[in-house]
């Protein structure tokens, strides 16, 4: 995809059909029927990510809970369709449509969202007409967050500098992947604990584009592009307000026919990184929409799954396992 393609106006679509990955299913019919009567788990990734971020976690959850797990790509991320708008209400409606289409309204559902995906999960939990039983939001609250983490801002800035060609890396050039990864690793915010994994997370939008491996000289003349530099997987040039949208929490006051305040039957857990500023220390703010919400604290920054994988996995497992056993 050329740079010009990234600058084209995105189509307007009220709903898109999200791409997803599903964990293994039982091979025999009787086991499959029983399997699909138990809660489904849906993972929603964070900003600039994709369903791939949950791959290792899903293997563990699947083994421990024998769970049916769906990992989705949010619109404009991964291989899901590219379209506007990209506000939280639209992203939530995409997920609701996914549930209606691929899982159904009656089946119990557990939601697990990281960062931006946490807000999408929380909004979906407030939707009346689907059977959400549990929701985990990893380090993002159900209200506007005025400031973004420097880690997000610095990595986003580097991505945009490469997209704008302030930093030029030729497609198909020797060791171009290494050059990209080293650029992200050199950011001050990525020199902390687990910084290499964070650098890979943000660099992956370049590394995952197959056409970036093909040098201009290897193309037939009619296929050659005026712009020979690497491209990003997301149409960020067509999403100028992305970071502002990520900060927001929608006004639901005029949508009470569809969204309701949280109830005791829908358990909500917030996993907070104590070194992160996203979730305010006043936890009563969380309980405005989710009166029965619980909070678990971790001595980490925003990326607590990377910084403390053992304790964060135990927290997720225990929260989901508690009721799952009742469906045996």
Swiss-Prot record:
UniProt note: phenotype after gene disruption: Reduces ethyl acetate production by at least 50%.
GO molecular function: acetyl-CoA hydrolase activity; C-acetyltransferase activity; carboxylic ester hydrolase activity
Active-site residues, record numbering mapped to chain: 115 (charge relay system), 139 (charge relay system), 302 (charge relay system)
GO biological process terms held by the UniProt record: lipid metabolic process
Keywords on record: Hydrolase, Mitochondrion, Transferase
Primary subcellular site in the record, as a coarse category: mitochondrion
GO cellular component: mitochondrion
Domain AB hydrolase-1 stretches: 39-309
Subcellular localization: Mitochondrion
Biotechnology: S.cerevisiae produces only trace amounts of ethyl acetate. These traces help S.cerevisiae disseminate in the environment by attracting fruit flies. However, as ethyl acetate is a key flavor compound and the most abundant ester in wine and beer, ethyl acetate-producting genes such as ethanol acetyltransferase are relevant for the fermented foods and beverages industry.
Catalysed transformations (reactions): ethanol + acetyl-CoA = ethyl acetate + CoA; acetyl-CoA + H2O = acetate + CoA + H(+); ethyl acetate + H2O = ethanol + acetate + H(+)
EC code(s) of this entry: 2.3.1.268, 3.1.2.1, 3.1.1.-
Keyword Lipid metabolism annotated: no
Similarity field: Belongs to the AB hydrolase superfamily.
Function: Alcohol acetyltransferase that catalyzes the synthesis of ethyl acetate from ethanol and acetyl-CoA. Can also function as a thioesterase by hydrolyzing acetyl-CoA in the absence of ethanol, as well as esterase hydrolyzing ethyl acetate.
Protein name: Ethanol acetyltransferase 1
Organism: Saccharomyces cerevisiae (strain ATCC 204508 / S288c)
Gene (name only): EAT1
């Amino acid at each position: 995809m050329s740079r010009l393609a990234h600058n084209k106006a995105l189509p307007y679509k009220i709903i898109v059909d999200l791409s997803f990955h599903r964990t293994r299913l039982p091979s025999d019919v009787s086991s499959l029927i029983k399997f699909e009567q138990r809660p489904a788990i849906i993972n929603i990734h964070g900003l600039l990510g994709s369903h791939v971020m949950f791959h290792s976690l899903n293997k563990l959850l699947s083994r421990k809970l024998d769970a049916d797990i769906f990992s989705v790509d949010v619109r404009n991320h991964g291989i899901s369709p590219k379209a506007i708008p990209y506000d939280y209400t639209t992203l939530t409606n995409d997920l609701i449509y996914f549930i209606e289409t691929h899982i159904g309204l009656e089946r119990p559902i557990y939601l697990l969202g990281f960062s931006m995906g946490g807000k999408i999960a929380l909004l979906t939990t407030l939707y009346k007409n689907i059977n959400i039983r549990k929701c985990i939001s990893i380090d993002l609250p159900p209200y506007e967050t005025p400031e973004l983490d420097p880690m997000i801002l610095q990595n986003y800035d580097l991505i945009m500098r490469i997209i704008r060609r302030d930093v030029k890396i030729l497609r198909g050039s020797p060791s171009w992947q290494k050059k990209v990864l080293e650029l992200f690793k050199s950011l001050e915010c990525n020199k902390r604990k687990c910084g290499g994994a964070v650098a890979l997370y943000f660099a992956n939008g370049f590394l995952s584009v197959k056409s970036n491996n093909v040098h201009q000289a290897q193309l037939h003349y009619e296929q050659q592009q005026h712009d020979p530099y690497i491209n990003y997987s997301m149409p960020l040039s067509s999403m100028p307000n992305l970071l502002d949208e990520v900060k927001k929490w929608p006004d639901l006051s005029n949508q009470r026919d569809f969204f309701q305040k949280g109830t005791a039957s829908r358990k909500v857990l917030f996993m907070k990184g104590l070194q992160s500023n996203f979730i305010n220390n006043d936890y009563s703010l969380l309980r405005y929409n989710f009166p029965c919400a619980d909070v678990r604290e971790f001595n980490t920054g925003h990326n607590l799954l990377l910084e403390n994988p053992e304790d964060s996995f135990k927290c997720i497992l225990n929260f989901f396992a508690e009721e799952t056993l009742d469906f045996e």
